[in-house]
């Protein structure tokens, strides 16, 4: 799993403040729109179902967006797309963070020690959107380390509703194995397509 420092995550919040302070003398519909969604060809489709056509972008944000399947984006909605659908807009992409996407694991298909490993992890946020269950997580790492950290969501058998367990394999890079002067916190976004598992319109879910 590629980790992203807290500084990078905070970038979106900083840009949002700048956008809110901008003087709205143009025809821009909205500044500082923050949303998660999927990349579809050269467009971005938000979890709310809006289609964003990237007509302007900062730096390499657009190129980086096209290299991923799912992302958390900060953009300015400039205008409705001429001749487009009712939910289609031209936007300026200001920042983006890649979102890791993984299928949900069942113990019937996977039951290895690596999958079941439960090293400490801090779930800072969890929400449902776009057919996914999304997490923002943090965990300890050694500064400059390239040690891979693996995240999985395991579906467990239950007679009442659905029960899921988020697991973390730190590959030995845990708090007790990191010198105190080399310890930092890293984290990132991860999404699991829960609509592949839950088909009911209403369901009881525990994580």
Where on the chain are the PLM-derived regions?
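Bacterial signal peptide processing site
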Residues: 24-26
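Bacterial N-terminal signal peptides that target proteins for export
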Residues: 1-10
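First exposed extracellular module after export/assembly in secreted or surface-exposed proteins
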Residues: 33-207
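C-terminal motif of bacterial Sec signal peptides marking the signal peptidase cleavage site
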Residues: 18-22
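Hydrophobic helical h-region of N-terminal Sec-dependent signal peptides
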Residues: 9-17
């Amino acid at each position: 799993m590629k980790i992203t420092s807290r500084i990078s995550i905070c970038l979106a919040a900083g840009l949002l403040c700048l956008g809110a302070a901008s003087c709205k003398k143009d025809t821009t519909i909205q500044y500082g729109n923050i949303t998660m969604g999927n990349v579809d060809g050269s467009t971005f489709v938000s979890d709310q179902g809006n289609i964003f056509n990237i007509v302007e972008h900062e730096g390499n944000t657009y190129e980086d967006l096209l290299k991923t399947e799912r992302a958390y984006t900060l953009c300015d909605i400039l205008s409705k797309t001429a001749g487009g659908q009712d939910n289609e807009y031209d936007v300026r992409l200001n920042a983006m963070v890649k979102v890791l996407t993984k299928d949900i694991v069942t113990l019937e298909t996977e039951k290895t020690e690596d999958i079941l490993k439960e090293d400490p992890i801090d779930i800072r946020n969890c929400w449902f959107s776009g057919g996914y269950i999304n997490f923002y997580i943090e965990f300890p790492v050694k500064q400059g380390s390239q040690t891979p950290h693996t995240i999985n969501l395991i579906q467990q058998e239950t007679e009442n509703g659905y029960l899921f367990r988020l697991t973390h394999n730190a590959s030995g890079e845990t708090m007790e194995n990191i010198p105190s002067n080399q310890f930092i916190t890293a984290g990132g976004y991860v999404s699991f397509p829960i609509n592949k598992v839950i088909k009911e319109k209403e369901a009881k879910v525990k994580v």
